[in-house]
Amino acid sequence: GLNRPSKRCLAGSAPCEFHKRSTCCSGHCIIWWCA
């Protein structure tokens, strides 16, 4: 997927609200999924 660190987040939290398909990875929101 696209690895784009964006806003910070907590691992295991709900998907980031700024993008429906973003995922929390390594403390940051990335689009799609963790590499």
UniProtKB/Swiss-Prot annotation:
Compartment(s) where it occurs, according to its Swiss-Prot or TrEMBL record: Secreted
Coiled coil residues, start to end: none
Expression across tissues: Expressed by the venom duct.
Entry keyword annotation includes Cytoplasm: no
Residue pairs linked by disulfide bridges in the UniProt entry: C9-C25, C16-C29, C24-C34
Transmembrane feature ranges: none
Record-level GO cellular component terms: extracellular region
Key words, A-Z: Cleavage on pair of basic residues, Disulfide bond, Ion channel impairing toxin, Knottin, Neurotoxin, Secreted, Toxin
KW Disulfide bond (keyword) present: yes
Main location: secreted
UniProt propeptide residues: 1-35
GO molecular function per UniProt: ion channel regulator activity; toxin activity
Protein origin, superkingdom: Eukaryota
Domain notes: The presence of a 'disulfide through disulfide knot' structurally defines this protein as a knottin.
Function: Probable neurotoxin with unknown target. Possibly targets ion channels.
Family from the record: Belongs to the conotoxin O1 superfamily.
Protein name: Conotoxin Cal6.1c
Organism: Californiconus californicus (California cone)
